Amino acid sequence: MEELLTIAFRTVVLYFVILVIFRFMGKREIGELSILDLVVFIMMAEIAVLAIENVDDHLFHTILPMLVLMIIQVTLAYFSLKNRKVRQLLDGKPTIIIKYGKIDEEAMKSQRYNFDDLMVQLRENSIDRVADVSFAILEPSGKLTIVKKENSGEHRQLEMPLIIDGFIQTENLSRISKDRKWLLESLQKHGYTNPSDISFCSFTDGEIYIDEKDGHRT
């Protein structure tokens, strides 16, 4: 009986400890968890199970590694927020699977993504024909984001990020047949001289959108 009460007590304590730790780690939908999140969650679950089973082991021996995991996750999340390269390393980056109704088989192979997966996710988005898709983007979470054709049958343009967190996205500039010089000239027309002052800048349908960083002029 005493052992059962101990198990119940440890279960309740660890439940609230994990709850607090997850709260500090930030909010995220289950479908949007990164590999880092999954690794941390799985390790915490294993540690908790071992702690509940080994009633003779001190709870501190369980809580300490959980706190260490939390510190690792929060630290990496901070650097991921500040640095896009770190973010891409930890979370991966989106991959264009369909462009203007044409499937990119090489992109699918690189992501180990097969045609069955593609057709399932198209059907889930009420898409019957690949030709009706302007863009299909495989997100790091595994979700397929779809941009449909216009009602007129014309393909829609994908919003292309040109600046993220103050850093120019050279690869995306080449995708729209533009260069760094063109971008800097466009920014100057809008009154910006330094890309580092810009939080996000994108290009779509011939128009440029600019969102400056907090604390800069409006």
From Swiss-Prot:
Topological relation to the membrane, as annotated: Multi-pass membrane protein
According to the UniProt record, one GO cellular component term is:
plasma membrane
Give its localization: Cell membrane
For this UniProt record, give its keywords in alphabetical order, as a comma-separated list. Answer: Cell membrane, Membrane, Transmembrane, Transmembrane helix
Membrane-crossing residue ranges in chain numbering: 4-24, 32-52, 59-79
**Chief location bin:** membrane
**Cross-referenced InterPro entries, in alphabetical order?**
DUF421, UPF0702_alpha/beta_dom_sf
- Which PANTHER family does the record associate with it? UPF0702 TRANSMEMBRANE PROTEIN YCAP
Give the family this protein belongs to, as stated in its UniProt record: Belongs to the UPF0702 family.
- Please identify the protein, giving its name as recorded: UPF0702 transmembrane protein YrbG
Gene that specifies this protein: yrbG
